A protein has these predicted regions:
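Sec-dependent bacterial lipoprotein signal peptides
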Residues: 1-19
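A structural "domain/chain start" motif
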Residues: 17-59, 63-66, 71-74, 119, ...
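Surface-exposed short loop/turn segments
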Residues: 23, 64-68, 74-75, 80-124, ...
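Compositionally biased, intrinsically disordered linkers/stalks adjacent to structured regions
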Residues: 146-171
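Conserved acidic
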Residues: 45, 49, 103, 145, ...
């Protein structure tokens, strides 16, 4: 019976050894956990894409939970961004059925983003490039399909921005 207890304890110890470096708390200091995200400037040809990306960045911060959304006067971190370009490319076409021909298109956007420490006024990340990608199907009314896909594109960019905010090296 003592051998079973010993083996059980040894098994638990071995399994928990892999978790020794895991932390339940964030590396972001408590006084740096407020964020403000103004509307991103949109230099692309896709209408309202700057608004969509900024809104999705806010949602991603809320979903992740480390940062609290704040006003510009009370925030510790401000995320400023510019949607600099978008592109649309055909990926795949199927000509087997001419009555219901569908085309897959890849929608890509590039954002330039800066992270500003509002307490010190220091730019922590200066003009980092983020590329978001998504795909959609369709032949007719590509502009509407592109606009509809912009939410998924914004999710991709937002996830990258929030990941970087969580991994900032704070002084």
């Amino acid at each position: 019976m003592n051998v079973l207890k010993y083996l059980f304890a040894l098994t638990i110890l071995g399994l928990s050894a892999g978790c020794a470096s895991y932390k339940w708390t964030s590396d972001v200091p408590e006084d740096k956990r407020t964020v403000f995200v103004p509307v991103f400037r949109n230099d692309s040809e896709v209408t309202e894409l700057g608004n969509v990306v900024a809104r999705q960045v806010l949602r991603e911060f809320q979903r992740e939970g480390t940062f609290k959304i704040s006003t510009p006067e009370n925030c510790a971190l401000e995320i400023q961004g510019i949607i600099s370009s978008t592109s649309l490319a055909r990926v795949n076409s199927s000509n087997r059925d001419y009555t219901n021909r569908r085309r897959e298109r890849r929608f890509t956007a590039e954002a330039t983003v800066s992270f500003i420490d509002k307490k010190s006024g220091k730019v922590i990340v200066n003009n980092r490039k983020y590329v978001g990608r998504t795909t959609f199907y369709g032949d007719k009314d590509v502009l509407t399909l592109q606009r509809n896909a912009s939410g998924r594109l914004a999710e991709d960019i937002a996830a990258q921005i929030v990941d970087d905010a969580l991994n900032l090296k704070w002084e």
